[in-house]
Amino acid sequence: MSSQPFPALPLDPKLQRVERYWRSLIRGANDTPFWDDFAPSALADMEEDVMLVDVFDKPLRLRFNTIVGAAIEARYGTAVRDRFSDEIEPSSPFEYFNAQASATIEARAPTVHQAAGYRRLLLPMWGDGRVSMMLGAFAWL
């Protein structure tokens, strides 16, 4: 797997569980799982703290999928579903989101960002010959 662009942090048990699930989806010698192997029901008890992000390239744009946990939107203060990351204010819990997402996509590896009050894990997922989606999860500190 590629080197991590962000320093590894000890993960909260909830984030460890999401990462373990993500790793369980990896097929054979691939570095990342395919996005269509993801089953939201596998993380149903964590649905409030999980999100999917669609990745578009040329130009790179990130769109919050229809799966964005209620706790995430509550912390942000408004709905972000179906919105592009460059259309929202980069405030908690989306501080440095675009930078972290870019690093996740380029490295094709998990990244962790920690800020006051939360830790965010982004995990790349493959499709159409590139990282086309990311699974995100939050732990509230």
Where are these regions (language model features)?
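Sensory/regulatory domains in signal-transduction proteins
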Residues: 2-28, 33-141
